[in-house]
Regions:
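Conserved beta-strand-loop-alpha-helix junction that forms the acyl-donor binding cleft
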Residues: 116-127, 145-149
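A conserved beta-strand-loop-helix scaffold within acyl/acetyltransferase catalytic domains
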Residues: 58-74
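Short amphipathic alpha-helix that is part of the acyltransferase structural core
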Residues: 1-32
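Conserved acetyl-CoA binding element of GNAT-fold acetyltransferases
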Residues: 72-88, 142
């Protein structure tokens, strides 16, 4: 397996959109919809590949904090992960961990002090285990919801 930062081109864009459609069809994240060109283009793209097959991807971008929060001071540059996805048949193989670690080392070498992300998974126990226990992230906040009325079909 190879982990690397990729340049976006039309072929890669199509592959990433197709992978995001698979993610959407899994129905594992609240409100997730497949990506469009506009969702992907402003981001740096990192891939995990086995031969010619993309096994997983991570994309995100660098920003500066607009205001001081309990975690980060105003003006501090950070890398925000927009998406991290691994194909279902390749989960629990360490691909997500390797993608995250690769990006962590890359942005750290560029002088960034933080990686930040939000997640919208239906399995919060697994995602907290991955990000907090395995990747060493601190838990900053949570946004919970309770649906009061079921959608009518």
């Amino acid at each position: 397996m190879r982990i690397y930062e990729a340049e976006l081109n039309d072929e890669l864009l199509k592959k990433l959109i197709d992978l995001s459609a698979k993610w959407e069809n899994e129905d594992i994240s609240y409100g997730y919809r497949k990506n469009s060109r506009e969702d992907i283009e402003p981001n740096r793209i990192f891939l995990a590949a086995g031969g010619d097959e993309i096994l997983g991807y991570l994309f995100g971008h660098t920003e500066k904090a607009e205001r001081t929060s309990s975690v980060i001071n105003e003006g501090t540059p950070f890398f925000e992960i927009e998406e991290l996805y691994v194909l279902p048949d390749h989960r629990s193989e360490g691909i997500g961990r390797e993608l995250f670690s690769f990006v962590e080392q890359k942005v750290k070498s560029e002088g960034l002090e933080y990686i930040i992300l939000s997640t919208s998974t239906k399995d919060f126990n697994s995602i907290l285990h991955f990000y907090a226990d395995i990747m060493g992230m601190d838990f900053g906040n949570a946004r919970l919801f309770k649906r009061l009325n079921q959608a009518k079909n």
